[in-house]
């Protein structure tokens, strides 16, 4: 037995010497015909260690994503969707229930006139529907017992922020990565949740706690879809524009100061608007998208936490579901409190804090809610978001002026408490003590 073992070891050593050539860096190129999807690419490198017992692997993943402003996307003469789906022989779509009620006939007519079969799942997408069960429902539709989508077949998603999150997450899970095209029917979906790579569903009392990074291959922004949005939803979406104005674009901030309320009243220049306001609406959308994507698109997998677009989203993920606030109002409270905190830290002056709060209140967004007085809740929120951001710091985006920001690595409990007290004192002098219009989910029938 001993001789047999010795012989085997000797043979192995000879094979190693004869056949194994140590190469410190091995890469493989793949022929284009083997590529899984036209939107995704990847390369890798393997480095073998001379001891013959370990390897080091590094890999890169490349994706292509586009954001496009389009007018009247469901007009049968508009080629955008037809060019995507005609050659594929069908369109598989997940459509928000309300969108289906408003635009379902136009959607079906579009594909009928362009001679493209349409297979659609109509899905209710309230905040209360942002659950793993909804994701599973969409997966059943996309999977083998449903439409059996291909790994290179872009699913069409049409809806607001909730649907973009849950349907996008379903696409990330189907075949481990199925592409999708996003048409945002709300302002939140059009300029924030839609083009975002963060697909998700809610966790237990923590908003967006479960998810994956999977951006759409194309985001279509059609301002004419905002015509049918209730004003409460228009206002809700404005918070995502204001956050970029405060942290990144002073011109956008001034446009919002001057035209913000008119954009709410005219449903983003779709009703009783003149040509000037239409141009302003397009400029506001473009600037908000550009500010958002120049930070999001260059940090697509959130590998760094210097993210201005997280302004207003440090404490709100914890208190929003507890207070049952509309997302935009929770962000409004978060932004206004963040401005007061920045004032307390000496990052901005009082006039700048007041301008930020005044912009929010001018369009009816909330800037204060008693929920932030719950110190335990706020500190738990900090703990949760710190873990979510990698535990190296809190990295809360806070304004350093109008159109610029810095990132607070830590907010000690005593500073948090004093900032809340100062913010409460300041907001007590505001109309309604800082409460916004239609600030709760129940106000818009979403509960």
Q: What label would you give each PLM region?
A:
Residues 2-154:
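ATP/NTP phosphate-donor binding region
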Residues 11-42, 51-56, 239-242, 348-447:
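C-terminal charged capping/lid subdomain of soluble metabolic enzymes
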Residues 145-185:
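A short, small-residue-rich loop immediately preceding and capping a beta-strand
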Residues 264-377:
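Active-site segments that bind and position negatively charged phosphate/pyrophosphate groups
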């Amino acid at each position: 037995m001993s001789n047999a073992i010795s012989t085997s070891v000797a043979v192995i050593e000879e094979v190693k010497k004869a056949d194994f050539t140590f190469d410190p860096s091995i890469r493989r190129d793949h022929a284009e015909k083997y590529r899984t999807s036209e939107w995704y690419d990847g390369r890798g490198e393997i480095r073998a260690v001379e001891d013959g017992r370990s390897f080091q692997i590094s890999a890169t993943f490349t994706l292509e994503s586009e954001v496009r402003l389009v007018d009247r996307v469901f007009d049968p003469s508009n080629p955008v969707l037809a060019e995507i789906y005609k050659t594929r022989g069908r369109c598989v779509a997940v459509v928000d229930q309300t969108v289906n009620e408003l635009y379902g006939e136009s959607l079906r007519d579009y594909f009928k006139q362009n001679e493209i079969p349409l297979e659609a799942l109509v899905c209710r997408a309230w905040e209360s529907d942002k659950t793993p069960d909804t994701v599973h429902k969409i997966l059943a539709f996309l999977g083998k017992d449903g439409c059996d989508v291909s790994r290179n077949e872009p699913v069409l998603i049409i809806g607001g922020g909730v649907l973009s999150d849950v349907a996008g997450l379903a696409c990330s899970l189907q075949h481990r990565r199925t592409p999708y095209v996003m048409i945002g029917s709300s302002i939140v979906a059009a300029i924030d949740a839609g083009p975002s790579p963060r697909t998700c569903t809610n966790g237990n009392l923590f908003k967006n706690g479960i998810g994956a990074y999977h951006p759409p291959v194309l985001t279509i922004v059609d301002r004419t879809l905002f015509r049918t949005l209730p004003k409460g939803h228009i206002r809700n979406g404005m918070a995502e524009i204001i956050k970029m104005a405060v942290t990144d674009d002073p011109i956008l901030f001034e446009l919002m100061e001057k035209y913000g309320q008119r954009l709410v009243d005219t449903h983003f220049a779709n009703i009783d608007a003149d040509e000037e306001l239409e141009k302003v609406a397009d400029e506001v959308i473009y600037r908000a998208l550009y500010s958002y994507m120049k930070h999001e698109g260059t940090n697509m997998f959130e590998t760094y936490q210097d993210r201005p677009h997280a302004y207003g989203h440090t404490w709100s993920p914890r208190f929003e579901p507890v207070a049952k606030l509309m997302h935009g109002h929770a962000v409004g409270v978060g932004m206004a409190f963040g401005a007061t905190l920045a004032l307390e830290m000496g990052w901005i002056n009082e006039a700048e804090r007041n301008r930020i709060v005044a912009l929010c209140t001018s369009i009816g967004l909330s800037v204060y809610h008693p929920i932030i007085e719950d110190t335990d809740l706020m500190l738990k929120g900090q703990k949760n978001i710190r873990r979510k951001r990698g535990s190296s710091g809190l990295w809360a985006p806070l304004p350093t002026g109008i159109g610029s920001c810095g990132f607070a690595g830590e907010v000690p409990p005593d500073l948090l408490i004093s900032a809340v007290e100062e913010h409460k004192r300041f907001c007590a002098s505001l109309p309604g003590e800082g409460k916004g219009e239609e600030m709760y989910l129940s106000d818009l029938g979403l509960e």
